[in-house]
């Protein structure tokens, strides 16, 4: 490890706004060394379209990491498979996108990189290329040999983790099992300690049903699943509050001393977070043997190369990755 964090950055879909965001954040001095895994020609061309200065330096893992000056990027070259037109997807570049991710994961696992920041990928075009791909999280978990990862989104001091992720609403109740819920809470508690430097995390847990089940009259998941799991983990030292009604949990009185919230399903917790932190929310994958943060938006093909893409979420993802790397690696 180095005293200056070395952060791997994958821009994602080359026809989307990922390269725009990388060029934009390069205009701001960074406390870490950014190592962008991309095609240098792509970054130079996107900088030209945006009218921004860009100096590219080749990555040398033998050289100690040093903070990047404004207008400069360190690049670990990965050639495109086909020319890129902003806003126009091409299946030929699907393998390029995955190659950058493969290389970034390998670098995080072998210690060359201290954290990973991922730009938005286009799942559809990767699958259209004949490569099964469900998303960053699953890809990173498989490549790093991790068990079921946990999705956490953050906007400022508000952190919301999910007990279930991308499921139809009718499938959510059956997906909340004692073993699954315990796993999520243990991962959340442990990563808040190691990656966020919170010595005794205080976690608020939502109920599944309206009014947290109203004593069993509006559903029994709180009584039969959620409550017993919380009780068992409390006896092991976890500081868990709940199950609480979600409609009152997200109020200043409850949030004031909370380090994280566990929502039972995607649209229970994320609308509040995105309302509070629109444009600066960050997606974080917990439970991996590496630090990964990401933007909380898509490829925005229609904005690529236009200069109209907002870099707020990317900059926050980078800032948080650096902060987490310092906590986890003692940098």
Curated annotation (Swiss-Prot):
Residues holding a divalent metal cation: 166, 211, 266
Gene3D superfamilies assigned to the protein according to its UniProt record, in alphabetical order: Isopropylmalate Dehydrogenase
Gene Ontology CC terms: cytoplasm
Entry EC no(s): 1.1.1.262
Single GO BP term: pyridoxal phosphate biosynthetic process
Binding site for substrate: 136-137, 274, 283, 292
Coarse class of the protein's main subcellular location: cytoplasm
Alphabetical UniProt keywords: Cobalt, Cytoplasm, Magnesium, Metal-binding, NAD, NADP, Oxidoreductase, Pyridoxine biosynthesis, Zinc
Annotated pathway: Cofactor biosynthesis; pyridoxine 5'-phosphate biosynthesis; pyridoxine 5'-phosphate from D-erythrose 4-phosphate: step 4/5
GO molecular function: 4-hydroxythreonine-4-phosphate dehydrogenase activity; cobalt ion binding; magnesium ion binding; NAD binding; zinc ion binding
Cofactor list: Zn(2+); Mg(2+); Co(2+)
Main enzyme class: oxidoreductase
Subcellular location: Cytoplasm
One family name in Pfam for this protein: PdxA
Cofactor note: Binds 1 divalent metal cation per subunit. Can use ions such as Zn(2+), Mg(2+) or Co(2+).
InterPro entries: PdxA, PdxA_fam
Miscellaneous information on this protein: The active site is located at the dimer interface.
Family that this chain belongs to: Belongs to the PdxA family.
Subunit relationships: Homodimer.
Stated role: Catalyzes the NAD(P)-dependent oxidation of 4-(phosphooxy)-L-threonine (HTP) into 2-amino-3-oxo-4-(phosphooxy)butyric acid which spontaneously decarboxylates to form 3-amino-2-oxopropyl phosphate (AHAP).
Annotated protein name in UniProt: 4-hydroxythreonine-4-phosphate dehydrogenase
Organism: Thioalkalivibrio sulfidiphilus (strain HL-EbGR7)
């Amino acid at each position: 490890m180095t005293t200056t964090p070395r952060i791997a950055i994958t821009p994602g879909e080359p026809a989307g706004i990922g390269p725009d965001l990388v060029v934009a954040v390069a205009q701001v001095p960074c406390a870490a060394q950014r190592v962008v895994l991309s095609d240098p020609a792509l970054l130079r061309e996107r900088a030209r379209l945006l009218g921004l200065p860009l100096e590219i330096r080749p990555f040398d893992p033998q050289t100690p990491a040093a903070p990047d000056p404004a207008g400069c990027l360190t690049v670990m070259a990965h050639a495109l498979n086909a020319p890129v037109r902003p806003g126009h997807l091409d299946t030929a570049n699907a393998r390029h996108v995955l190659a950058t991710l493969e290389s970034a994961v390998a670098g995080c696992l072998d210690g060359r990189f201290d954290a990973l920041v991922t730009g938005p990928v286009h799942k559809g075009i990767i699958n259209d290329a004949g490569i099964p791909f469900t998303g960053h999280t699953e890809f990173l978990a498989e490549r790093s040999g991790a068990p079921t990862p946990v999705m956490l989104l953050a906007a400022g001091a508000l952190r919301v983790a999910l007990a279930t992720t991308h499921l139809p609403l009718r499938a959510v109740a059956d997906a909340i099992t004692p073993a699954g819920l315990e796993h999520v809470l243990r991962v959340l508690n442990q990563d808040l300690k190691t990656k966020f430097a919170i010595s005794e995390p205080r976690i608020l847990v939502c109920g599944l049903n309206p009014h947290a089940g109203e004593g069993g009259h509006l559903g029994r998941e709180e009584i039969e699943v959620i409550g017993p799991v919380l009780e068992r983990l409390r006896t092991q030292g976890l500081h868990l509050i709940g199950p609480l009604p979600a409609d009152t949990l997200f109020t200043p009185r409850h949030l004031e001393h909370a380090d994280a919230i566990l929502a039972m399903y995607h649209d229970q917790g994320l609308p509040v977070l995105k309302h509070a932190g629109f444009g600066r929310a960050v997606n974080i994958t917990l439970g991996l043997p590496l630090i990964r943060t990401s933007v909380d938006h898509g490829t925005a093909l229609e904005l690529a190369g236009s200069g109209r893409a907002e870099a707020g979420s990317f900059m926050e993802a980078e800032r948080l990755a650096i902060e987490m790397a310092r906590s986890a690696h003692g940098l």
